Amino acid sequence: MPSSHRLSATILIFLSLTYISSSSNLVEDITDKQDSSEDDDHLQTFPTPPPIGTTTASADSLFNRMNKILRKEEKQKSQNFQIFNEKDLVTNSNANPYFSTTRKPKNRSDSSQKARDPDPQNQVIAGIPDLSDPCFRRYENSIIVNAQPYERRSSTGLIHCKSHCLNSQIGVYSCRSFVYDNVNRVCDLFAHVGDQAPARLLKFQTRDYFEPTDIVHCLSMINGESSSSAPSSEDEDSPPSPPPSAPIVALATNTDKRDEHEEMTETIEDITVASPSSDSCPRGKQSTFLRTEGFELFSHDDQELVVGDVAECAKACIENKINGVALKCKSFDFLSSTSTCAFTSEAAVPVGNGQLKQREDASYHEKICVSKSFVESCPSTFFSRHPQMILVGFAESVSDSPSFEHCFDTCLNSYQLFGFNCTSGMYYFEENQLNCILNSENRNTQRELFTEENTDIVDYFEVECTTPRSKQSKRKMAGVRNFETDAIGADKMVTDHEDVEEDGSKWESWSECQDGKQTRRKICANFNQIEDCAEEVRDCVDEIDSTDMRMSIKRAGELENNDHEQIEDNNTDASEDPVPTKEEIAEVKQKIRRTGFKCPLNECCRVFLSCSYGLRHNSHTKQLEWCRRPCDPSLSSFKRSRLLR
């Protein structure tokens, strides 16, 4: 073979090997890229550099991709908690943000919801904390959900919230994190960090999440800063260690104002003048107690007293003097095993800042102020209270109450206001509307429907007397203002009052006679007290001769022959047309609950088979009223309610 041919063959072989090597590198590069695309988080191998003179996407795109992956890994490593969106949590502006279970419906517009949570895409919490404070890690606009704080402190500043967390490292609970509400100045302490399952962290405007860091070093620093802070600071109204003679007015929420204005302005002289026994309740009211069995107030024993009976404890707390020492008593614990009472100027959450602890031989008693007339008619000094319990299915009235005591007073005056006797109720502390629910039954009559409530902060209470209440011992027809209560087997709501009560309130003049009844209302001089707007009903009275006053309707079978009374002609008809029985009344009551009352306003409609009584929807009082003679039994046609159709 000529040398020229051998040289040409050698060159061809060399070029072929070079091409094969280049193709191999390209295949390896493509394979590596495919492997890396299958795993966005990590690159298993680095691609082989292309041969010199070959053009690709160049090193710039590869460099940018590598930086993107490294930034993603770094972000994941710095993320301290779980990321999720607002839609993962069912909550409202007035709701408890620490729970994610389904809540009661709220009267809340879409615009207010959007204002609260402006952009769903911005609900992801940033993972980088604020470390400007060496004692705490701060996560701005964040809250804890799926968890409940072990303690809530209201009307307190951020400095005191930090100090309390650092000081709460030993005991039943240890502060591991807290959430501070910058608007309402509420401090919620938690015994765990915010991302400890099942708890999670969520972005929430106006609230910040904190975790303590160097507790030992920061404790002295925080206490020193708190004690030396100027009076003009944000915490001027909440000193860390107030004297017992001037306790802080602790609120459960901004909706729970338990006589705040009265307690803030009341002086010792006013208390002394108002009551010889130094009762701190305002005029016209008297102290009584809500009792919680099986619990005591933890670490709040200002004074102790050995007694023979729990009534002695109540007397000492009402007088605000224990063992000769003045103490503005708000609650006390009674230990049955040692017959000892422990008094304190603090109350349990959500009204105060104290924490209840289970103890079998103890009972916790919290002071409240109720109408003096009710206390006098009901000798019982204690009323049952059950935190986080509710009675299901027997709500007769739902109303708005600014405080627990207002709701309790509403229950006491339920007959005058709503026409039924309230025996129990529930107050939802964190609701602004429809937060007071009154029941016609209680846990003793409906044990199977008495259950726990773990979503909202609520108190269940009962209004039961050891002896029947005067002129209200029997149950009235629920939901109906009973004008003719004698006819349905209950006592008549006719109480003779003078025009001026003991508390100084006055009554309007009696109305003109209508359907054999007269009404009058108490002058509403103070709209904060519900009893000021109470209503009374009585039989029509002849102003010329009061001796002619008598019951317009008498119980069936019990009509009396009285020679000193002039019997009207329609009484004869009433005796011939008997009054409804209890069974008939119960049946009508169930129909009203099931289908409502369908009758023209202010017209007396027939609801029973007899024509003795009917029902009327009074447009002025917004209540159902008993009325007489809805029909004439001698006529073949008459007006009747759709209840009978």
From Swiss-Prot:
Protein name (database record): Uncharacterized protein F52C9.5
Keyword match Repeat: yes
Compositionally biased tracts (Basic and acidic residues): 107-119, 556-567
Domain of life: Eukaryota
GO BP: any one term: anatomical structure morphogenesis
Carbohydrate-modified residues: 107, 421, 570
Protein's UniProt keywords contain Mitochondrion: no
Domain PAN per the UniProt entry, residue ranges: 135-214, 281-369, 378-465
UniProt keywords, alphabetically: Disulfide bond, Glycoprotein, Repeat, Signal
Signal peptide positions on this chain: 1-23
One Pfam family cited in the UniProt record for this chain: PAN_1
Compositionally skewed regions (Polar residues) per UniProt: 92-102
Residue pairs linked by disulfide bridges in the UniProt entry: 161-187, 165-175, 281-369, 313-341, 317-329, 378-465, 407-436, 411-422
Region (Disordered) location: 30-58, 92-129, 225-247, 556-582
Matching InterPro entries: Celegans_DevNeuronal_Protein (IPR052774), Pan_app (IPR003609)
